[in-house]
């Protein structure tokens, strides 16, 4: 059973956040994560209202927002997440020592741990980063929180490959309940050791091949067939001249079709 269904995985997953996310994916029939990098709260909330019915996960970079506030941004964002049944992933990419990331996660302007179901981290500083972030989650949130490790990136010339990727996977193994997956371009293994990593893949496009700043796009079928569970799509949903509702529906359908193909191939 190389590729179990989302429902099967949800029922036995070690991570409460992963189980919740997998259940949402199964019930909404979507493996689409919308990445909405805009500069105002009004733009963000408007886009979320359009794509919300079609996504399982919203990926944010709140430090891009010129007008971020807990009351004006986070509160309505959480309300939309409840309305449309999706989780929130703040793409913070923590990359410091344990004590520092603990404070970055819990404190400051953004207080990420209070509202983001999921965040992520680089493995460059070692396993202390996982410990620091988990402590912040335990001390500052009554809701379950989960961490993704950045194993691979979609940008041209990325150094996240080879020994770095292998080392990052080893760091992820230090906490099975808190670390539940990776940002990666393919499956990261681990099933023979009892790990069920969720793989989220950026750089997915149905139309575009790349941009002038080094982004490289792969097709939905390609990333799902090689082990990705969630496709992360940004400008493909709301870029110039695009209808966010229509595009999110199109990517949702493409992602779900690719998932069904993977399940069928595994059962044959």
UniProtKB/Swiss-Prot annotation:
Family: Belongs to the OMP decarboxylase family.
Pfam families hit by this protein: OMPdecase (PF00215)
Active site per UniProt: 93
UniProt pathway: Pyrimidine metabolism; UMP biosynthesis via de novo pathway; UMP from orotate: step 2/2
Organism: Maudiozyma exigua (Yeast)
Gene Ontology CC terms: cytosol
Residues given in the record as substrate binding sites: 37, 59-61, 91-100, 217, 235
Gene Ontology biological process: 'de novo' pyrimidine nucleobase biosynthetic process; 'de novo' UMP biosynthetic process
EC number: 4.1.1.23
This protein's UniProt keywords: Decarboxylase, Lyase, Pyrimidine biosynthesis
Catalytic activity: orotidine 5'-phosphate + H(+) = UMP + CO2
Name of this chain's protein: Orotidine 5'-phosphate decarboxylase
């Amino acid at each position: 059973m190389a590729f179990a269904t989302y429902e099967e995985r949800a029922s036995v997953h070690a991570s409460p956040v992963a189980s919740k996310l997998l259940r949402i994916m199964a019930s909404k029939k979507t493996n689409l994560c919308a990445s909405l990098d805009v500069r105002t709260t009004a733009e963000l909330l408007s886009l979320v209202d359009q794509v919300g019915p079609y996504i399982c996960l919203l990926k944010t970079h709140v430090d891009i927002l010129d007008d971020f506030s807990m009351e004006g941004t986070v509160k309505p964002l959480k309300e939309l997440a409840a309305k449309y049944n999706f989780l929130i992933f703040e793409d913070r990419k923590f990359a410091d020592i344990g004590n520092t990331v603990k404070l970055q996660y819990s404190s400051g302007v953004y207080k990420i741990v209070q509202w983001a179901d999921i965040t992520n981290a680089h493995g460059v500083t070692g396993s202390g980063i996982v410990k620091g972030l988990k402590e912040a989650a335990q001390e500052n949130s009554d809701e379950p929180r989960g961490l993704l490790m950045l194993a691979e990136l979609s940008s041209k010339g990325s150094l996240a490959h080879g020994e770095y990727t292998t080392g990052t996977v080893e760091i992820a193994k230090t906490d099975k309940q808190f670390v539940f997956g990776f940002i990666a371009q393919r499956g990261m293994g681990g099933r023979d050791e009892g790990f069920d990593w969720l793989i989220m893949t950026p750089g997915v496009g149905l139309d575009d091949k790349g941009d002038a700043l080094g982004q490289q796009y792969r097709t939905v079928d390609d990333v799902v067939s090689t082990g990705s569970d969630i496709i992360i799509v940004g400008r493909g949903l709301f870029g110039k001249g695009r209808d966010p509702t229509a595009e999110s529906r199109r990517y949702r359908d493409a992602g779900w079709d690719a998932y069904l193909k993977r399940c069928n191939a595994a059962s044959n």
